A protein has these predicted regions:
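A conserved catalytic-loop motif detector
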Residues: 206-262, 266
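Structured C-terminal helix/loop/strand segments within mature extracytoplasmic catalytic/sensor domains
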Residues: 6-19, 23, 27-94, 224-242, ...
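Short, conserved catalytic-motif segment at the N-terminal edge
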Residues: 95-121, 137, 141-144
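Active-site-proximal beta-strand/loop segments in catalytic clefts of secreted hydrolases
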Residues: 103-105, 158-162, 170-174, 196-198, ...
Length: 321
């Protein structure tokens, strides 16, 4: 009996000592932890939560911007694909050589397309007159020639009525073809486009590349070579031209507007037009040049031009929505 009581007391003592030791250990750990604890008042907590919210808002904004950027990129890819399909469909109707270029000048879209079945320059017809006008104002600003009322009137007639006599007088004032070709070289850096003879005269064809026509439209929209005032004069002369109702601008929807300079020589199968078109907050340039194998019959090419202007404009409009 005594042995049993001893064992009982001994066992309880062990339990007590173990509990006591654990208590001491726990107290030490708690004190050590407490020395590292930072206590915050309400003001500190407000700052912490404010910083936390700020970081989360910044992360959310970054995620949103990235998502928006991807969405815009997808929209832009879709627009480029749609315009590419339009060009392919319309130019498949043309029996001959062609070049087509489209480029965003202003707005959220990013279109810069060039379709062609020939790398050779094409006869320019009257589209060369845009370059003659730019050259005239460049030389006026340089002081090489004087801006007389007669010259200003001829530049306007050259662009608005496509008057060949007025054009040839402007060429004479400039001193000949080389002056215009120097301006073209400054604009484009290449020799794809060139003035080789007076308008409606015999001789070597005046030549153009639609990429250069787009560059000319860029110069009118955001002038670098000539002043904004003179660029505006050219654009005003390209408003309500005598071909507005027959080519790229003919079937423009009511929500769009544009200016243009066309060229044609139906008895040689030549049909061309270049335009700047506004739709919503978008402004784009569109240039088409064709030299067909059907002389004296340009009805099909005129229809292609009208369709192209209308359908490409509608594509940009859908992008805007």
């Amino acid at each position: 009996m005594m042995e049993k009581n001893y064992w009982y007391r001994s066992n309880n003592l062990k339990k007590y000592l173990l509990a006591f030791a654990l208590s001491i250990l726990a107290t030490g750990i708690a004190r050590s932890y407490a020395s590292d604890v930072v206590y915050y008042d309400d003001y500190d907590l407000d700052i912490i939560f404010e910083e936390y919210d700020k970081e989360n808002v910044e992360d959310l904004n970054e995620d949103t911007e990235e998502a928006d950027s991807l969405e815009e990129e997808e929209k832009n890819d879709k627009l480029n694909e749609e315009i590419s399909n339009i060009i392919s469909e319309e130019m498949d109707k043309v029996d001959g050589s062609y070049q087509v270029a489209v480029k965003t000048l202003e707005g959220d879209s990013d279109v810069d397309l060039d379709f062609r079945n020939t790398s050779e320059s094409l006869p320019s017809a009257s589209t060369i007159k845009v370059f003659i006008a730019i050259s005239a104002y460049e030389n006026i600003e340089r002081g090489s020639i004087n801006e007389t009322d007669s010259l200003s009137n001829d530049i306007h007639l050259m662009l608005n009525r496509s008057d060949n006599y007025a054009t040839n007088r402007v060429i004479d004032v400039l001193g000949g073809f080389s002056t215009v070709n120097k301006t073209i070289a400054k604009l484009t850096g290449l020799n794809r486009t060139s003035l080789n003879r007076k308008l409606a005269h015999s001789g070597k064809e005046n030549m153009v590349d639609v990429s250069d026509l787009i560059i000319a439209m860029e110069e009118l929209n955001d002038p670098k070579l000539i002043s904004a005032i003179n660029a505006e004069k050219i654009k005003q002369a390209m408003t309500n031209t005598n071909t507005k109702s027959s080519k790229l601008l003919a079937n423009l929807p009511s929500y769009a507007s544009g200016i243009n300079k066309s060229g044609e020589n139906p008895d040689r199968g030549q049909e061309l037009d270049v335009a700047i078109i506004d739709v919503g907050s978008t402004r784009f340039a569109l240039a088409v040049a064709m030299k067909t194998n059907k002389y004296y019959d340009n009805a099909n090419e005129l229809k292609v031009l009208r369709n192209m202007g209308e359908r490409v404009t509608e594509a940009f409009y859908r992008f805007e929505k």
